[in-house]
Amino acid sequence: MIDRSGEVERRCHIATREVIAVALTFILHLGGCGGSATPPSATEPPTPPPPETEPLVSAFVAFVGVDVLPMDSEILLVDQTVIVKDRRIQTVDLRSNVALPQDAVQVDGTGLVLMPGLADMHVHLLEEDLPAYLAYGITTVRNMWGHAAVSDMDALIRNGALRGPFIYSTSPGIDGPPAKWPVTQLVESPAEATATVARLVGEGWTMLKVYQDLRPDVYQAVVEAARAHDVPFVGHVPHRVGLREVLLSGQASLEHLGGYDVALGGARGTAGWLQMDAGKIPEAVTWTWESGAYVCPTLAVFKEIAATSSAEDASVIAGNRRTFVKALHEGYVPLLVGTDSGIDLVAPGSSLHEELREFVEAGLPPYVTLAAATITPARFLGEEEEFGAVREGLRADLLLLTGNPLTDISVLSDPAGIMVNGDWYSGDALETLSRRSGNF
């Protein structure tokens, strides 16, 4: 979640969905939410989808005569057959080399392109949004504020009882006072920070989120405890710590380009981006590259925030942020595509395609843009043997497209079919999923 510093709080009345009240949304300002990471639960657990949304489930599915964009390299493999068996990619080879299993369900791939499913690397997940992610080809998400309902959804998705993208989640956010969001892990001293990290790791969180109001000594205690427990920490640049110190700390990812506003423009938020000093960009890029951190810019949602400024200022702010993202790419900093969806400023699912367009408009090459939503997230999460590419042995999370996204990225938003964990959505099943998503 972005620190909007008063710029869009007046918009927050739009967050009226019932789920927000019972499943931890991130619009409501609640105080005193420190303590246990277990939030109030919804009255009912996540439920499987109704029968009409069921995808085709088969032990064998064969995509025949399809062109493959594997995404672990910048090539297009033509006239391939891709066989999926038991939810894994079993075969990727020339059609002429492959004998089809007799019981395989065949999908004619002639004139179509198969690529990995997409990853949204910054979401705030609600069960009601699961169909939207799938309908837009998003088969993996990184949830950026953990709570019990997310853990429940993850377990149901992984055992096939609930349809949705695979979830990788951070812990609830660790922050200093005042607590801003539900289940904030409020820490006010190094000792509290050390104990909180130990408790969160004991609860099973494998990635920690830091937030914006940690004091420098408390942030350092979180860093040391995370290292001691061998868990990565990600999130915001705390205001009193600053960009340089966060990069030196080993924070694995930085969200929203936070901290760069101050480093480049001398002020937080839109004011910093409005007065960005381009002469400071090379140093900030070098710091970032040397740190090994990944950056998740969330350009599209920040455009919504900047829209509260004048049209001229909003254009400058968006342009400066795109300029900096291009500089990060040119400086070999790995980028992640993320949206901040789930807070009602951008729509789940469709906003990822807006973010991809922002990357392209920033001047990033199409392959780099696509990689930031496929193979790069897999590398960041250490899951290259699970997802992010069309390769034998990986999870069968796939998009079937009517064209080549390397030449026309818009084809991503209207897939011919979607496979998530081996379940195939096309035709009526895809149409039903699309209707349920609420974004069509």
Predicted regions and their residues:
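His/Asp/Glu-enriched, well-ordered alpha-helical/loop segment
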Residues: 316-401
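Histidine/acidic-residue-rich catalytic or RNA/ligand-binding cores of hydrolases
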Residues: 154, 243-251, 265-267, 301-322, ...
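Histidine-rich, glycine-flanked metal-binding segment
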Residues: 48, 52-59, 68, 73-115
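C-terminal motif of bacterial Sec signal peptides marking the signal peptidase cleavage site
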Residues: 30-32
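Acidic, glycine-enriched loop/beta-strand segments at the rims
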Residues: 51-54, 68-81, 94-95, 347, ...
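Bacterial signal peptide processing site
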Residues: 34-37
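Divalent-metal coordination cores built from histidine and acidic residues
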Residues: 109-114, 129-238, 251-260, 265-308
